[in-house]
Amino acid sequence: MSDAANDTKVRFDPERLTFNEAGLVPAIAQDAETSEVLMLAWMNAESIARTLRTGRVTYWSRSRQAFWVKGETSGHVQELVDLRIDCDRDCLLVLLRQTGPACHTGRRSCFYTGVRDGHEQELMTPQD
């Protein structure tokens, strides 16, 4: 029996993704080695193309309305390992190698607050 995943190769076209009304798609950043979810950001067709072209993960900043090359100013670079598309083509999983903390608060992950027994609990502190 053949492996269907290896039988067909379709050229990736970012325009075939399902973008929201602002032309954006959510992108989940995940450490390729540990599988830890690091952050959620937004990408448009051009930021996806730039990411694939350069290997440096590039998002679209909704607040600044500009491209955001992760680590360009902080040095906390995200290097692309793999890009995956979900089944509905409306969300991306960006597998990457993270240098330093991913969160602007200095924490490894933006998901540093847990909810325990109805209360918020800080699960990690900023890295030095």
UniProtKB/Swiss-Prot annotation:
Alphabetized GO MF terms: magnesium ion binding; phosphoribosyl-AMP cyclohydrolase activity; zinc ion binding
The keyword Zinc appears for this protein: yes
Residues bound to Zn(2+): C87, C103, C110
Residues noted as binding Mg(2+) in the record, renumbered to the chain: D86, D88, D90
Catalytic activity from the UniProt record: 1-(5-phospho-beta-D-ribosyl)-5'-AMP + H2O = 1-(5-phospho-beta-D-ribosyl)-5-[(5-phospho-beta-D-ribosylamino)methylideneamino]imidazole-4-carboxamide
Single biological process term from Gene Ontology: L-histidine biosynthetic process
Cofactor binding, per record: Binds 1 Mg(2+) ion per subunit. Binds 1 zinc ion per subunit.
Subcellular location: Cytoplasm
PANTHER family membership: HISTIDINE BIOSYNTHESIS BIFUNCTIONAL PROTEIN, HISTIDINE BIOSYNTHESIS BIFUNCTIONAL PROTEIN HIS7
HAMAP family on file: HisI
Entry protein name: Phosphoribosyl-AMP cyclohydrolase
Organism: Roseobacter denitrificans (strain ATCC 33942 / OCh 114)
Designated gene of the protein: hisI
